[in-house]
């Protein structure tokens, strides 16, 4: 199934309503969306996405995430984000009550896409809505942070090369 922006929001709101039925306490939970779904939610790309990925969520909502096919098996993403990515998350104002939904920052998403470099990732970050809005100074720092945490020189060199080519092509 493919999801456009409205369908992603509807799914997140249904998840929020279901969590409110399960947990009637005042507790508020969180979920950070990454990948193409995050870019769709941020209105940076207008394609549909095959899945909704979450890099981080309150443990209490994980069973519901699985029931709603929100993918938490994104270990590859974890290595593409600096440890402090949570400082830059953007809250989604979609009217949820029980779960605060966030997206990773645009810069963190670009780094993760540069690290992956699948065709759809390249297409996503080649969109003017992405490269014209990205903070290049922040992106420079995040690339170095991610490279510092990588385990081998091959991956470091690939990410640096991908970023250098991206920056040369799109930075104005």
Positions of predicted regions on the chain:
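Compositionally biased terminal segments of proteins
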Residues: 1-172
């Amino acid at each position: 199934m493919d999801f456009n922006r409205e369908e992603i929001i509807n799914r997140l709101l249904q998840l929020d309503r279901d969590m409110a039925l399960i947990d009637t306490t005042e507790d508020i939970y969180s979920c950070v969306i990454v990948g193409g779904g995050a870019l769709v939610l941020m209105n940076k790309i207008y394609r549909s996405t095959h899945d909704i990925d979450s890099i981080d969520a309150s443990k209490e909502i994980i069973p519901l995430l699985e029931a709603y096919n929100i993918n938490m098996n994104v270990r590859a993403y974890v290595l593409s984000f600096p440890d402090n990515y949570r400082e830059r998350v953007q809250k989604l104002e979609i009217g949820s009550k029980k779960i605060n939904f966030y997206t990773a920052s645009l810069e963190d998403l670009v780094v993760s896409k540069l690290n992956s470099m699948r065709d759809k990732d390249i297409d996503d970050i080649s969109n003017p809505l992405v490269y014209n809005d990205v903070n290049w100074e922040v992106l420079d720092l995040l690339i170095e942070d991610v490279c510092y945490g990588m385990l081998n020189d091959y991956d470091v060199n690939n990410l640096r090369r991908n970023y250098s080519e991206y920056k040369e092509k799109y930075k104005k």
